[in-house]
Amino acid sequence: METVRTDLTKRNIWRAFDIPIIIAGFLVILPILGINRTTDFAIFCIFVLAFNILYGFMGRLSFGHMLYLGTGAYAVTLFSEHISQNPLLAILAALVAGALIGVILGPIIVRTTGACFALINLAFCQVGYFLVLVAFSRYTGGEDGMSAYFSKMPLLNFGNKGVVFGFVLFCLVLAYFFLKKFTASPYGVLIRSIKENETRVKFLGYNTFNYKWITFIISTTVSAFAGALSIVNYGYVTPSFIDPSRAVEVIFAALIGGSGSLYGSIIGGVVYMAISNYLASYIPRWEMFLGFALLIVVFRFRTGVWGFITGLFTRRRDALAR
């Protein structure tokens, strides 16, 4: 009994201090990686969080999530050019655009499952890529892309990289906190039940379509949020933000960290970015070695890095309980 109580206490301590630990972790790697790269890491972690809500918690694999990242990136850029250079209003516009694309595409996409769900997302991403690259190149800048310009605000000068890093880190904590509350709610329990056995959930009287649709909208909105923050950091957008061939990046990160876990999303995002950045600096064909790393994770650590860590503590607890 004492061992179980101790384990629960440790778990509650982790849950209480998870956000300070995340902040401390990024502050630790900041002097090692530099401010630009650390900011990139934080933005990518937000994107992985958004993807994992669909894949890890609801069991729907998407090959087209770059579409929703790109939606936020282009929305914030177009807003800053044609409407207002207020950065907060531009980010808000990106959130609205992300939610809107989820509302429009959701009824079509969430009716599908398995490979069909993955491929229909990819198909829409291909369409979006064509639209920004060719069809609407007059407005999007085509292959050259376009720049975003933001006005200075009190205490929020995005021309200062330190301010950008602090703002992005705050946004990461905000996204994590929101999704943590969402997944811990009865709604979050229900979407995990849909992943395990949707037929049984329907039999209990729930309209699973509405729950899947709302979850999809949340995922697209948070993805657009990450895209908007990328433009705040980089200052320009190109079709690479919506390139379907980059879809595997967020999938790799989710698998490495551990799907179905918000902690795993952040760990996976950091590990993937660290590996890809390090290998790209020293090895010409770095993608091949990244593939080998993923194979090791899939076959050796099936639950990802976070699942492996929690598994070690679980086995230790069970050993002490004997």
What is each of the regions a protein language model found here?
Residues M1-R322:
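Transmembrane alpha-helices and adjacent helix-loop boundaries
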